[in-house]
Structure formats: structure tokens, C-alpha cells
């Protein structure tokens, strides 16, 4: 009799499951979107001649970061007032690395605006005085 009960329970469980009818596969869990994140964003070089002259400003760039995490487009939105600084900012930002934004678990392109600040050092570096002396002497 014990053996009958042992086989009856699994059979009843199978019948109960079959009676429930077809169950639909559970919906795939929604994957939360993630935003773009900076990984490696070193500042551009600040030419010492411009820094010593007190030339500075803020360059604003429109940057499209592709699914692979690198800038695919870089455009000037607002000039610092110094063409050389604007160009240096654009060149350096093209080298930056990001963790791409994701939608439904897949990396996607995203466009952001990036301000790049150039602030003259205070106090002036000693190198500035040497540059000024050379300029006074005509070379």
C-alpha cells in the first residue's frame, strides 16, 4: 500500500498542473535605462602663453557619444573667445571615454553639452615671468 501512495502523489501533482492549462511564459523583466557616464575625461592642455596672458573662458561643446562609449560628433556651441582654446577643447573631448547610455539593456548614442573651462592660474606660474622677459627682449 505504501508503494501505491508513492506513485499516486506524483501522478496527482502532474494532473493538477495539467488542469491549470497552458501558462504563458513570464514576461521578461524590464531593464532600467542607464544614463551616460564619464569614465576618462582629462582636461585639455592650457597653452602657457595664453594662461600667462590671462586669456581664458568657457567653451561649450555638443558631444554625441556612440554606443561604444566614444564621441562620434563634437561641435562648438559657445566659444570661449579664444579660437585656440576652442580647438584644444574639441580635440581633447574627441579622446574622452564614456560608459554609454542604455535602453532595454542595449547601449545607445546620446548627445550632451559639455562645458570646458579655461581659467588662468593665480598666481602666475614662474614660467610666465620668463616668457614676459623673453618678449621684452624681442624673442
Q: Where in this protein do the model-derived segments appear?
A:
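C-terminal motif of bacterial Sec signal peptides marking the signal peptidase cleavage site
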Residues: 16-19
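Residue-level structural signal for beta-strand termini and adjacent loop
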Residues: 76-77, 113
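Short proline/glycine- and basic residue-enriched helix-capping loop/turn segments at helix->loop/beta transitions
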Residues: 27-62, 88-126, 132-134, 138
